[in-house]
Swiss-Prot record:
Name of this chain's protein: Hydroxyacylglutathione hydrolase
Key word Metal-binding present: yes
GO biological process terms, semicolon-separated: methylglyoxal catabolic process to D-lactate via S-lactoyl-glutathione
Keywords: Hydrolase, Metal-binding, Zinc
Domain of life: Bacteria
Cofactor remark from the record: Binds 2 Zn(2+) ions per subunit.
Length: 235
């Protein structure tokens, strides 16, 4: 049975651990020590790392983990080639721990950002999509980020969204400022506030929920998306 657990890291990162029996897959290790502690506590053997993009708060733990577990497979796009020993490309599919993994192009935040859709049910999207928001455009461009959101919108509503940061509360404040008031948005703001007051993650979300509460997922045109993204950058 698959278990998915977030390890809080740095100020607001999540390192996601996919656990199946005694084996584990690590997504975007921001640091190594927290992962070591989790693996030891649960007596897990890490078999692979999935990297979404080349920002230090998603890769800084790789070197330490590889030093301890040198046989791990490390997947990523060409922009993380200094870490990855398995370079993957959009729409490539592979299997880990009996799980089918599909690579989804999600550039924009960075030029070669990718996401991983596991068993057509679990989306590990790094900084391409957050609950209520999306990543800033750095080394990618607005068109690429907009296109990535269209790919996410095309996924089934039941797909769970495992983003790389706990940004939900601030994102929903922005959503409240730019979207028409809705019961769904208010309910999710209340839910996020309660969870964070209990020091619990607001993630995962789902694609269906994000279509309702995420202004960037509701942008119909590129121009509309750019206006929203620039407003959020200065919010």
């Amino acid at each position: 049975m698959l278990q998915i657990t977030p390890i809080p890291a740095l100020s607001d990162n999540y390192i996601w651990i996919l656990q199946k029996e005694c084996q584990a897959i690590i997504v975007d290790p921001a640091e190594a020590q927290a992962v070591f502690a989790f693996l030891a506590k649960h007596q897990l053997n890490p078999t692979a790392i999935l990297l979404t993009h080349n920002h230090h708060d998603h890769t800084d733990g790789v070197a330490g983990l590889v030093a301890q577990f040198p046989d791990m497979l490390i997947y990523g796009s060409e922009e993380v080639s200094q870490f990855a020993n398995q370079i993957v490309y959009p729409e490539q599919q592979f299997e880990l721990l009996g799980l089918k993994v599909r690579v989804i192009e999600s550039a924009g935040h960075t030029a070669q950002h990718i996401s991983y859709l596991v068993d057509n049910e679990y989306l590990f999207c790094g900084d391409a999509l957050f609950s209520g928001g999306c990543g800033r455009v750095f080394t990618g461009d607005y068109q690429a980020q907009f296109d990535a959101l269209q790919r996410f919108k095309a996924l089934p509503d039941f797909v769970k969204v495992y983003a790389g940061h706990e940004y939900t509360q601030s994102n929903l404040k922005f959503a409240e400022a730019v979207m028409a008031t809705s019961c769904s948005l208010m309910e999710h703001q209340e839910r996020a506030d309660i969870l964070r007051s209990q020091h619990k993650p607001t993630l995962p979300s789902t694609i269906g929920v994000e279509k309702q509460i995420n202004p960037f997922m509701q942008a119909v045109t590129l121009d509309e998306f750019i206006i929203l993204r620039q407003k959020k950058d200065n919010f």
